[in-house]
Amino acid sequence: MYPDNRRYSREHEWVLIESDGRALVGITDYAQEQLGDVVFVELPEAGTQLDQSQKMGEVESVKAVSDLFTPLTGEVAEVNQALVDHPELINDDPHDKGWMVRLASVDATQLDSLLSASEYESFLAELG
């Protein structure tokens, strides 16, 4: 169910390390299901330096406002501007078109603290 080429946080963010070493970050399908229809996303500006587990923004849905946390230390190289006008992309395609930020200068050693797809699925099963 969850792509094997990513790592996952217990806060329900995913990370995809791209061929150039940058990291694409978004929220998982589980997270978007729990949120319901996403109506607004607040993300950091390009150039912002983030530390692992630091709050990087908020996602607002019809149910709640939830904080977003960065799963890796890095610098925001790019923000998915499509989410400004179309936040529903997070619901429609959370693991692809609904990506949130692209990080550069990431600390790849922190990947070991994140979950594989199968570990994340087991984590979700424990949540009930």
Each model region followed by its residue ranges:
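Acidic, low-complexity mobile loops and tails
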Residues: M1-K55, D93-G128
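Periplasm/extracytoplasmic soluble domains of Gram-negative envelope assemblies
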Residues: G21, V62-A64, L72
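A short beta-loop-beta micro-motif enriched in histidine and acidic residues
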Residues: G36-V38, V62-V65
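Short, conserved catalytic or interaction motifs in soluble domains
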Residues: S61, Q81
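Histidine- and aromatic-rich ligand-binding microenvironments
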Residues: D67-P71, A104
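Basic, polyanion-binding surface patches
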Residues: H86
